[in-house]
Curated annotation (Swiss-Prot):
Homodimer. GO terms for molecular function: metal ion binding. One of its GO terms (cellular component) is cytoplasm. Keywords: Cytoplasm, Iron, Metal-binding, Stress response. This is Iron-sulfur cluster repair protein YtfE. The lineage of its organism: Bacteria, Pseudomonadati, Pseudomonadota, Gammaproteobacteria, Enterobacterales. GO terms for biological process: protein repair; response to nitrosative stress; response to oxidative stress. Di-iron-containing protein involved in the repair of iron-sulfur clusters damaged by oxidative and nitrosative stress conditions. It is found in: Cytoplasm. InterPro entries: FeS-repair_YftE, Hemerythrin-like, RIC_family. The gene is ytfE. Belongs to the RIC family. YtfE subfamily. CDD domains: Hr-like (cd12108).
Length: 221
């Protein structure tokens, strides 16, 4: 199979566990899902042959992931809300509290991620509004079979996905790519573990919307 000339989004759909591989190599398969594997690898000076070999191995492994290309869009929407929207509503307030504690207790340390709590608070506020608009406006349109008429709302949602992707870049910069320093306390380590989980969840969430739900809706499925 020719992997290098396929888009990251298409590969993430065809090979569900490719998302973990892409995340390990900092390959943006959600907001940047339209770029080819070759182009993305070249930008990061990654070995394209090694990536193709890893993808080939993943594709031959058995897996039990849901095939969302075949499921009705109403099922996909229900999954996105229960698995990602509801989860983000639980994750972010707790992450903000932990970040505030780390900055308050360790603010005198050079490794302290100053500004992290404020950035996470901004993500919480904007993502809360974003998910509300999806649940109250866009998703009902799609569920009523009006997805082909939803290009305007979809364009706005994709732009907001790009914006939160940029906010995640700031979080990574503040946290040394979400790596706790030597000697970090338990709260600090738990905070970074939670941030990593949130980033993984959010990237998979955006991938399902940008690369599966929205294109299928626009095709009138």
């Amino acid at each position: 199979m020719d992997y290098r000339n396929q888009s990251l989004g298409a590969l993430a759909i065809a090979i569900p566990r490719a998302t973990k591989l892409f995340r390990q190599h900092q390959l943006d398969f959600c907001c940047g899902g339209k770029q080819t594997l070759l182009r993305a690898a070249n930008k990061l000076n990654l070995d394209i042959d090694a990536l193709e070999a890893q993808l080939s191995a993943l594709q031959t492994e058995p897996h039990s992931s849901e095939d969302w290309q075949q499921q009705p869009l109403t099922n996909l929407i229900s999954f996105i809300i229960s698995r990602y929207h509801d989860r983000h509503r639980e994750q972010l307030p707790e992450l903000v509290l932990m970040a505030e504690k780390v900055e308050r207790v360790h603010g005198d340390k050079p490794t302290c991620p100053r500004g992290l709590a404020a950035e996470l608070s901004a993500i919480l506020e904007e993502l809360t509004q974003h998910m509300y608009k999806e649940e109250q406006i866009l998703f009902p349109m799609i569920q009523r079979g009006m997805g082909s008429q939803a290009s305007g709302p979809i364009f706005v949602m994709e732009a907001e996905h790009d914006a939160v992707g940029q906010q995640l870049d700031v979080v990574k910069q503040l946290t040394q790519n979400v790596t706790p320093p030597e000697g970090a306390c338990n709260t600090w380590r738990a905070l970074y573990t939670g941030i990593n989980e949130f980033i993984t969840d959010l990237m998979e969430h955006i991938h399902l919307e940008n690369n599966l739900l929205f294109p299928r809706a626009l095709r009138g499925e």
